[in-house]
């Protein structure tokens, strides 16, 4: 598609709504500045969107969000290289939710993780979705991830939507041949 429209709670997207939509990238290590500590990485958006917060309030908020994603707040002075892939993904999620967005856009959120971490991250995202009423936009080739987290699915081919609907309906009875092939090859 050459154009489209994005609405958040009925409001057309504009730069002032950027806080309401945060990203979690496929490769969190590549998205982190290796010279920044966990405190600096996770609080970066707070410094932009809530500049009135003092250092103590910012540190407390970072500690709170780290605990929400299953990390201890005693890691604030550590650097990204000191963490496993799953821990880095938790840090990326913490960085995204610290400003309390309404929407998280997740690009292949588990593709770089081993199976154990994949399950933990999926469970964490489902919990955060329930606790905070988050809407998740998941970009993934892994149909198991889509089935685990999504309510609705859009299947794209060459940048065009070829099928959309409720996840269970599309997975149970796909209309497009391309979707049928995807599901067949994925074994779902």
Where are these regions (language model features)?
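ABC ATPase NBD coupling module
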Residues: 5-22, 36, 40, 48, ...
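Conserved ABC ATPase "signature" region
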Residues: 56-74, 183-184
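Conserved ABC ATPase signature
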Residues: 79-83, 87
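Conserved catalytic motifs of ABC-family nucleotide-binding domains
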Residues: 100
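A short, surface-exposed alpha-helical micro-motif characterized by mixed small hydrophobic
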Residues: 146-148
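C-terminal boundary and immediately downstream tail of ABC-type ATPase nucleotide-binding domains
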Residues: 171-188
């Amino acid at each position: 598609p050459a154009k489209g429209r994005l609405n958040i709670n009925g409001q057309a997207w504009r730069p002032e709504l950027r806080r309401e939509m945060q990203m979690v990238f496929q490769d969190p290590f590549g998205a982190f500045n290796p010279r920044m500590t966990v405190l600096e990485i996770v609080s970066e958006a707070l410094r932009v969107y809530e500049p009135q917060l003092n250092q103590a309030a910012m540190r407390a908020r970072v500690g709170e969000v780290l605990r929400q994603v299953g990390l201890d707040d005693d890691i604030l002075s550590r650097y990204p290289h000191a963490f496993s892939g799953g821990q880095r993904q938790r840090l990326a999620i913490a960085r995204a939710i610290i400003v309390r967005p309404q929407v998280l856009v997740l690009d292949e959120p588990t593709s770089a993780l081993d199976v154990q971490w994949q399950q933990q991250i999926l469970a964490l995202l489902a919990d955060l979705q329930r606790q905070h009423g988050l809407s998740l936009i998941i970009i993934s080739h892994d149909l198991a991830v889509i089935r685990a987290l999504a309510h609705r699915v859009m299947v794209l081919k060459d940048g065009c939507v070829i099928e959309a609907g409720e996840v269970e309906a599309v997975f149970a009875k796909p209309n497009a041949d391309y979707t049928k092939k995807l599901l067949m090859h994925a074994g779902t």
